[in-house]
Amino acid sequence: MVLLESEQFLTELTRLFQKCRLSGSVFITLKKYDGRTKPIPRKGSVEGFEPSDNKCLLRATDGKKKISTVVSSKEVNKFQMAYSNLLRANMDGLKKRDKKSKSKKSKPAQ
């Protein structure tokens, strides 16, 4: 997995969306990141690890290529604005769900 800066991540994410426009999917995950690079041991003493500030880890993949970035709490507003604009621009292939009318279901069958 490639760890990128925020701007590079958005550029690569745009490329992933363009590549998967006709067929394929892009999977995006977002989770809290505390800066650990090693897993927490199940048993034993836990070292006093204190994260310096809150961070978010974003990952994106198309099944073959994986990219990720870490966004700190200081730059989250700037990143969120650019990220939301990117999603609005590239999620135009979504289909609306067919809503079934309630009037047809409420009539008793005779």
UniProtKB/Swiss-Prot annotation:
GO terms for biological process: protein targeting to ER; SRP-dependent cotranslational protein targeting to membrane. GO terms for cellular component: cytosol; signal recognition particle, endoplasmic reticulum targeting. GO terms for molecular function: 7S RNA binding; endoplasmic reticulum signal peptide binding. Its main location: cytoplasm. It is found in: Cytoplasm. Residues 96-110 have a biased composition (Basic residues). InterPro entries: Signal_recog_particle_SRP14, Signal_recog_particle_SRP9/14. Keywords: Cytoplasm, Phosphoprotein, Ribonucleoprotein, RNA-binding, Signal recognition particle. The modification Phosphoserine is found at S45. Residues 90-110 are annotated as: Disordered. It comes from the Eukaryota. Component of the signal recognition particle (SRP) complex, a ribonucleoprotein complex that mediates the cotranslational targeting of secretory and membrane proteins to the endoplasmic reticulum (ER). SRP9 together with SRP14 and the Alu portion of the SRP RNA, constitutes the elongation arrest domain of SRP. The complex of SRP9 and SRP14 is required for SRP RNA binding. Belongs to the SRP14 family. Heterodimer with SRP9; binds RNA as heterodimer. Component of a signal recognition particle complex that consists of a 7SL RNA molecule of 300 nucleotides and six protein subunits: SRP72, SRP68, SRP54, SRP19, SRP14 and SRP9. This is Signal recognition particle 14 kDa protein. It comes from Canis lupus familiaris. The gene is SRP14.
